[in-house]
Every structure is written in structure tokens, then in C-alpha cells.
Swiss-Prot record:
Non-catalytic component of the METTL1-WDR4 methyltransferase complex required for the formation of N(7)-methylguanine in a subset of RNA species, such as tRNAs, mRNAs and microRNAs (miRNAs). In the METTL1-WDR4 methyltransferase complex, wdr4 acts as a scaffold for tRNA-binding. Required for the formation of N(7)-methylguanine at position 46 (m7G46) in a large subset of tRNAs that contain the 5'-RAGGU-3' motif within the variable loop. M7G46 interacts with C13-G22 in the D-loop to stabilize tRNA tertiary structure and protect tRNAs from decay. It comes from the Eukaryota. WD repeats lie at residues 52-91, 94-133, 137-178, 180-220. The keyword Cell cycle does not apply. This is tRNA (guanine-N(7)-)-methyltransferase non-catalytic subunit wdr4. GO terms for cellular component: nucleus; tRNA (m7G46) methyltransferase complex. It is found in: Nucleus. It comes from Xenopus tropicalis (Western clawed frog).
Length: 396
């Protein structure tokens, strides 16, 4: 997992987190989360601690100022770090269920975490030992949570194709639903600006643009229909696994699809309108990406030789940045810790289990019907032969 903030970069893999301050030549901050305290069982509830829990990091994010970094792991810990003036662990708190996503509020005062049971909890950043507060809930697993740029809305998406927009000050008040996806909604990204636009990605292979206040769909892009300059594969799923945005020179978007060895680059034109500007093919399937504050696109490649890639837009085309000292230094540190990071988080089909099971009842019905007809035909044939033999015996 790769995350960039205004103060630097964070990389996670397995239970490890590497934190790097922008422009620093010092070795990155390195922590194994398995070394942190674990939640103890309450008296009389020895079974409350899950013995199957690992320390794998599940979700992470920087605060808008870059001053804080938070992550959650498979042991149901919410770990908060301070990144300025140096990286250090501030607190370890616990969540009730394993989390699928987390984000900070625009003011940086709260952390919102979404979990597998469909709930969203908020945690205070300043009161770093305070327990979380339940804000809202869905009836199915949440896959992402976001906050509108003005901080007025909490936006959530779930396994059952729904995008829900709730008021921050009264989360039980639902402002709108953005409905149209035909599979689980995997990614949410509110776009900067005053137009109240939301971008969503899904397992149905579409990228959709919404007016989230009204719930109106503005545009839908079918990813399988884009000209990517590569051979089309039958039944290929374009599951959106990551979206990142840069607003330095207009709104530029970078997107990844699970199992697709390349980067989709879009721009948001007036209208508004999503336009594919470029597809960058890679030799390895990228694991993650993010923009930094200077409009550079960083890519976690999963390749031991070149674990980090950096791109810059020049004359309307995204080009690889070569001989970058910071990338070279960080890549070397990643290679040194490659085994601990488990290949910086090797590719996994995170969303494969979320697809609806297709039950072909018609095929089963036809097989049973054919078997029934064969049995009836055999019985009829046997019934016709028996009387004929009796007649012959009578004539004798």
C-alpha cells in the first residue's frame, strides 16, 4: 500500500510500515506493527480476542496536513502516528470489527473507519486515547468511506451496489443515494471544487461520475470499451481497485484495475466530462499509486528491481521520471526490506469473493428434464414388449 501526504510518503506491506519525510536523506521510519500492544480479553470473556487475527495492515491514510498518519490492521488496532517533526507512534486504539477503509476529515480532527459489518466509527485525533463513536451503519459490508471537501457529508459505499450520502452533523439523515452500479462499489473519490462531484469505481467495470448531493449520475465510462492499445480478453473483469486525484493543473485522475498491468489516466473536462487521456502499460501489475503535492504520480510496482516508479505530465503526456535521487534511495530501502514487506504487498484478488454467484438453474433443469424423458421412454418401451410375448404364448 502506498500513501503520500504533504510531508512525505508511507509504504505498508504485511505488518510493516515505512515512513519517509519529503526531502530527508535519513533512513525511513520502520515499524513492525506486530510489536505493538494487543487487545487483552475482558474478564470472563477470554474468547473475545480473535486468535486467528494477524498483524496485516488493511487500510491507511494521511491527514490533509500530512501531520498525522493512521492505519488499521487485522488485529483490529487503529494506530495513529505523528509525522512532524519526526515519525513516532502516538496511540493504539481498538475497533470492534476488521476495517476495510479509513479517511480523515478535511479539518484533520477526526478519523473515520469503515468496517466489514457495515458500520462507520469516528475517532478523535487530538484526544488520541478516546474510544470511537458510532456514526452510521449499512446492512452490508462497507468497502470505502470518504468525506466531501467541505466536510458536510460522509459518503459510503457497500457490497450491495449502493453509494450513500449522509450529513456529517447528523449521520442518520441520508441526503441521497447514488444508484446505478450493478456490482459492489469498491472506490470513492469526491473531486475538489464547488461542483459537488463524486467519482466511483466498481466491480461492474465502470467508472461513474455523480452529483452526490442530488444522487444524479453525470457520466458512466465502461472500461472494457476503452481503446487501451492491447489485445482484448474475453470475460476480462475491470475491477477498479484504486483511484487518486491531482488538482494542480486541472483535475487529473489516475486509476488501477485489479490484475491489469497498466495505469489509466483521465482528466475532468468542463461539462463535466471524464476523458481518458492516456493508458500507461507496465511490465508488472502495479500494486498502488498516489499523487504528491507537486503533481508527481508515484507507483508501487511490485517489481523487485524497480519497486517505485515516478511520473510527471509533460505536454499533455505522462512520462517516467528517470534518475530521481529520492526514488533511487527509497527503492534501495524497499529492496533491503523486501522479504519483511512480503514484496511490498504482493498482488491479491481482494475483490474476487465479492462478486455475485451466478447460478445456472436452466442448465440443471434441462439435464433433469432429459433424464426424466429418457426414463419415461424406457418404461414405455418395456411396457410395449411385455403384451406381445403374452399373445404369442396364448396362440401356442
Amino acid at each position: 500500500m502506498l500513501r503520500l501526504g504533504s510531508s512525505g510518503l508511507a509504504l505498508t506491506g504485511s505488518s510493516r510500515v515505512l515512513g519517509h519525510r519529503a526531502g530527508s536523506e535519513c533512513p525511513p521510519f520502520h515499524l513492525d506493527c506486530s510489536s505493538l500492544e494487543k487487545q487483552s480479553a475482558a474478564p470472563g470473556q477470554e474468547g473475545s480476542v480473535d486468535p486467528q487475527g494477524s498483524d496485516k495492515i488493511l487500510a491507511a491514510a494521511f491527514s490533509p496536513s500530512g501531520e498525522y498518519f493512521a492505519l488499521t490492521d487485522d488485529n483490529k488496532r487503529l494506530i495513529l502516528f505523528q509525522t512532524k517533526p519526526a515519525w513516532e507512534t502516538i496511540s493504539v486504539r481498538w475497533v470492534s470489527r476488521r476495517c476495510t477503509a479509513l479517511t480523515f476529515s478535511p479539518c484533520g480532527a477526526h478519523i473515520l473507519v469503515a468496517d466489514k459489518s457495515g458500520d462507520v466509527f469516528s475517532f478523535s485525533v487530538r484526544r488520541s486515547r478516546e474510544a470511537g463513536r458510532l456514526e452510521l451503519g449499512h446492512l452490508s459490508m462497507l468497502l470505502d468511506v470518504a468525506v466531501s471537501p467541505d466536510g458536510n457529508h460522509i459518503i459510503t459505499c457497500d457490497r450491495d451496489e449502493k453509494i450513500r450520502v449522509s450529513r456529517w452533523d447528523s449521520p442518520h439523515v441520508i441526503m441521497s443515494f447514488c444508484l446505478g452500479h450493478t456490482e459492489f462499489v469498491s472506490q470513492l473519490l469526491p473531486l475538489p471544487g464547488a461542483d459537488k462531484l463524486l467519482l466511483s469505481g466498481s466491480g461492474d467495470g465502470t467508472l461513474r461520475l455523480w452529483d452526490y448531493e442530488s444522487g444524479r449520475e453525470v457520466q458512466s465510462v465502461t472500461l472494457s470499451g476503452l481503446d487501451l492499445g492491447m489485445e482484448r480478453q474475453e470475460n476480462k473483469r475491470f475491477t477498479v481497485s484504486r483511484i487518486s486525484c491531482c488538482a494542480c493543473n486541472g483535475i487529473q485522475l489516475a486509476m488501477l484495475c485489479e490484475g491489469v498491468p497498466g495505469i489509466f489516466l483521465f482528466s475532468v473536462a468542463p461539462g463535466p466530462r471524464l476523458t481518458l487521456t492516456q493508458y500507461v502499460a507496465l511490465t508488472h501489475t502495479p500494486l498502488d499509486l498516489d499523487f504528491d503535492g507537486s503533481a508527481y504520480l508515484w507507483v508501487l510496482s511490485g517489481d523487485w528491481e524497480e519497486p517505485l516508479l515516478k511520473y510527471k505530465e509533460l505536454n499533455g503526456q505522462w512520462q517516467s521520471v528517470v534518475n530521481d535521487e529520492e526514488v533511487t534511495r527509497l527503492s534501495g530501502f524497499i529492496r533491503e526490506n523486501w522479504a519483511d514487506l512480503e514484496g511490498a504487498g504482493a498482488p491479491e484478488n481482494r475483490f474476487a469473493v465479492l462478486y455475485k454467484a451466478v447460478v445456472d438453474n436452466m442448465a440443471t433443469y434441462l439435464q433433469k428434464k432429459e433424464l426424466r424423458l429418457e426414463n419415461e421412454k424406457r418404461k414405455t418401451t418395456e411396457g410395449q414388449v411385455a403384451p406381445a410375448s403374452k399373445v404369442q404364448k396364448t396362440e401356442c
